[in-house]
Swiss-Prot record:
Keywords of the record: Cytoplasm, Cytoskeleton, Developmental protein, Differentiation, Neurogenesis, Phosphoprotein
Region (Disordered): 48-83
GO biological process, one term: microtubule cytoskeleton organization
Function field: Activator of KIF1B plus-end-directed microtubule motor activity. Required for organization of axonal microtubules, and axonal outgrowth and maintenance during peripheral and central nervous system development.
Native source organism of the sequence: Rattus norvegicus (Rat)
Presence of the UniProt keyword Phosphoprotein in the record: yes
Subcellular location: Cytoplasm, Cytoskeleton
Main location: cytoplasm
Domain of life per record: Eukaryota
Record family assignment: Belongs to the KIF-binding protein family.
Protein name according to UniProt: KIF-binding protein
Pfam families: KBP_C
Subunit structure: Interacts with KIF1B; positively regulates KIF1B microtubule motor activity. Interacts with STMN2.
């Protein structure tokens, strides 16, 4: 290998690197890129001092495209001799010029420099002195094309980097030179250990960018795999920012939650808690330049975001259990519960083998700390009230934690979503509760937390959220009324207080369903002839429940009862008529449509009998 460049070149190059690292906010306000432009001028001086690129490489530069830069393009050779060494150093300079132009938002110029870097390196890409720089240049081009929304091109560059890393490790394996070493004297070269650390960091970045590209392409399985690998490697090489690592692990948990892989989701969230606890406690490094303790706002925001991921974990696990155990009217099916209890024994027997197949974060003390968090949280579906309550309390703990940051003043949408999740936790817990009075109290808690939101919200700006809450409050009152009716049915003769309570709940449910339906009307207060796909099912359910509610009003006045039956029939008829003219609606409410048809058939006869009875009296 040829000797190091002269002192002038080395000094200018090191000065350029130092200027490149100056943070933008440390530049004059009117010249935010002053240090970047200074670094660029020095890099251009270094390039001039190194001399022109070898001719054969220059000629190839114009024809190179991302696909041609795949590994199969020409056999690699060692970077020996003065010409090869000059090409290497020029490539390092071109790389830094490329990054410099991208940092100053001159993307096309940045791309040109990076492509020139690859052209100079291509013949030597698998050599000890080139492989790291070649991968870094391709990674940066991958990011650049990703920002241009050219995701396929970005993917080509990044997958090429991954393949080159794998080929190098398989065929050579020894730690390659870091690009900066081409401008260092022999006595200042890096140790093998430091080279390995830096090369592995480059590859970790490659996996991280691939995860983002696959996510963008909706290749979610692949994205999750690469994200998991990235997080695992960051811990192994101690190259991570605790706050950023924790939020990425918590975000990954959402993928596993949606896949109903609760053991993996729990592991990600437990690891997120442990690593987030390191915030502000680790020594700042090149990888973690910011001292996180100086960012209280961001700290509390990230803490709230991780808490919201935990809420989703608890809620989804409970809801999945409910779906597995409910009958066709949404009540607990004891036979299904017994079947799941039998399955539980099998799940516990297989727990260890499932755990071994799952990717685990950390080793030694870190692994123990993560396991300690995991052991306090169940990952199997709750099968009874006590198990469900355990998850509910954990979810509620994180609701309070999330609300500390996501307050109504400043974070309206986030705050409302957290409250809706809290309500949903009570709703699913009520499914596991056998005592009907206690179930009523749970629905009452839901209403108490949701009704104030309606008062604070401007329906003009928050129409969608407003509708969601109106519908949910209506449903809570509806469920409470059903429970009170079921309790009353067990009495010989319900007293006037019980009747009054049932009618009051009925009226409240009607009020909120009507508010929801009225929100669908046009500015002239006319109900739409065609209901939008996004609100079709809730609108049809609201109509069905309004019809049922009118039929459930308890009154001693025959005339009033006849009016209620007529209103009930009107709403049932609307559902039947709408589904006849809009067949797509029938698929959304098959059960309710069949019941509506029955009521449209039965109610007129019932009303006639009622009129005849009234005439006789």
């Amino acid at each position: 290998m040829a000797g190091a460049p002269g002192p002038e070149i080395r000094e200018k190059f090191q000065a350029a690197l130092a200027l490149s690292r100056v943070e933008l906010h440390k530049n004059p306000e009117k010249e935010p890129y002053k240090s970047k432009y200074g670094a660029r001028a020095l890099l251009e001086e270094v390039r001039a001092l190194l001399g022109p690129a070898p001719e054969d490489d220059d000629e190839r530069a114009a024809d190179d495209g991302p696909v041609d830069q795949a590994l199969g393009a020409g056999e690699p050779r060692d970077a020996e001799g003065p010409g090869a060494q000059r090409a290497l150093r020029l490539a390092v300079v071109e790389f830094h010029l490329g990054v410099n132009h991208i940092d100053t938002e001159e993307l096309s110029a940045g791309e040109e420099h990076l492509v020139r870097c690859l052209s100079l390196l291509r013949p030597y890409r698998l050599s000890l002195g080139c492989v790291s720089l070649f991968i870094q240049a391709q990674n940066n081009l991958g990011i650049l094309w990703s920002e241009r929304e050219e995701i396929e091109t970005a993917r080509t560059y990044l997958e090429s980097s991954e393949a080159l890393y794998n080929q190098y490790m398989k065929e050579i394996g020894s730690p390659p030179l870091d690009p900066t070493e081409h401008f260092l004297p022999e006595e200042e070269k890096l140790t093998e250990q430091e080279r390995s650390k830096r090369f592995e960091k480059v590859y970790t970045h490659n996996l991280y960018y691939l995860a983002q590209v696959y996510q963008h392409m909706e290749m979610f399985e692949k994205a999750a795999h690469y994200c998991h690998s990235t997080l695992k490697r960051q811990l192994e090489h101690n190259a991570y920012h605790p706050m950023e690592w924790a939020i990425n692990a918590a975000t990954l948990s959402q993928f596993y939650i949606n896949k109903l892989c609760f053991m993996e989701a729990r592991h990600c969230l437990s690891a997120a808690n442990v690593i987030f606890g390191q915030t502000g406690k680790i020594t700042a490094t090149e990888d973690t330049p910011e001292v996180e303790g100086d960012m209280p706002e961001l700290y509390h925001q990230r803490k709230g975001e991780i808490a919201r991921c935990w809420i989703k974990y608890c809620l989804t696990l409970m809801q999945n259990a409910q779906l597995s155990m409910q009958d066709n009217i949404g009540e607990l099916d004891l036979d299904k519960q017994s079947e799941l209890r039998a399955l539980r024994r099998k799940e516990l027997d297989e727990e260890e083998s499932v755990r071994k197949r799952a990717v685990q974060f950390g080793t030694g003390e870190l692994r123990d700390a993560i396991s300690a968090v995991e052991e306090k949280v169940r990952y199997l579906r709750p099968l009874d009230f006590e198990e469900a309550r355990e998850l509910f309390l954990l979810g509620q703990h994180y609701v309070y934690e999330a609300k500390e940051f996501f307050q109504i003043d400043g974070y309206v949408t986030d705050h409302i979503e957290v409250v809706q999740d809290h309500s949903a936790l009570f709703k699913v817990l009520a499914f596991f509760e056998a005592d009907m009075e206690r179930r009523c109290k749970m629905h009452k808690r839901r209403i108490a937390m949701l009704e104030p939101l309606i008062v604070d919200l401007n329906p003009q700006y928050y129409q969608l959220v407003n509708r969601q809450i109106q519908f949910e409050i209506a449903h809570a009152y509806y469920d409470m009324m059903d429970l009170k009716v079921a309790i009353a049915d067990k009495l010989r003769e319900p007293d006037s207080h019980t009747v009054k309570k049932i009618n009051s709940l009925n009226q409240s449910a009607l009020k909120y369903y009507q508010l929801f339906l009225d929100s669908l009307r046009d500015p002239n207060k006319v109900f739409p002839e065609h209901i939008g796909e996004d609100v079709l099912r809730p609108a049809m359910l609201a109509k069905f429940r309004v019809a049922r509610l009118y039929g459930k009003i308890i009154t001693a006045d025959p005339k009033k009862e006849l009016e209620n039956l007529a209103t009930s029939l009107e709403h049932y008829k609307f559902i039947v008529d709408y589904c006849e003219t809009h067949p797509e609606a029938a698929q959304e409410i098959e059960v309710e449509l069949e019941l509506s048809k029955e009521m449209v058939s039965l109610l007129p006869t019932k009303m006639e009998r009622f009129r005849a009875k009234m005439a006789l009296t």
